[in-house]
Amino acid sequence: MPRQARLDSPGTLHHVMVRGIEKRPIVNDETDRKDFVRRLGALAEETQTPIYAWALMSNHVHILLCSGALGLAKFMRRLLTGYAVSYNLRHRRHGHVFQNRYKSIVCDGDNYFTELVRYIHLNPLRVELVKDLKELENYPYCGHGTILGTPARQWQDCESVLAQFGTRTSEGRLPTVRTKIVRSLVENYGVAVAEIARQVGISTSGVLKILTRTLSI
């Protein structure tokens, strides 16, 4: 179960949420988005901080990570400060880009881990940044596509996520992860089977077969 973060020790699983100041956008265009993702990846590699899931939205960002030796506070400070300086210079503005304090929840339990991965990676679909699951699989500002194998990002820890979803092989990525996503959409978000069939590009009977599989949620 989640609880409010009181720890900043290495090896702690955190769901981090950062919002723009006064709910304003934190990215204005593709250059901003690419810059934020580049900084996240470079810092994750430099500090050996595992990133399991992430989604960059218009006015906030979700990151599921395991704090490394640097600790969460210093990691987030470097990420947000570096990006804010670059953002302000590029857009010729001054002042805060993010709310003063990011929100962090310490997470326990394998079941909650997989649900968080689904929740975070479904955000672009939920707010209609993408129109369907096919677009989500190719959306470059969310970690979902990387888990499925495209695009490859060395800094995103896909193997740990795939292990929780029940596979480690490249061949097993798409059917296993897609199955879990489809079940999550039906059971947690009430999306109609016919609509999921349209989004995924398979038949209604195919969706129903997915829903009757004995994979754990």
Where in the sequence are the language-model features?
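Short Pro-Cys-Gly-centered "Cys-loop" motif that presents a nucleophilic cysteine in a tight turn
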Residues: 1-53, 57-58, 66-217
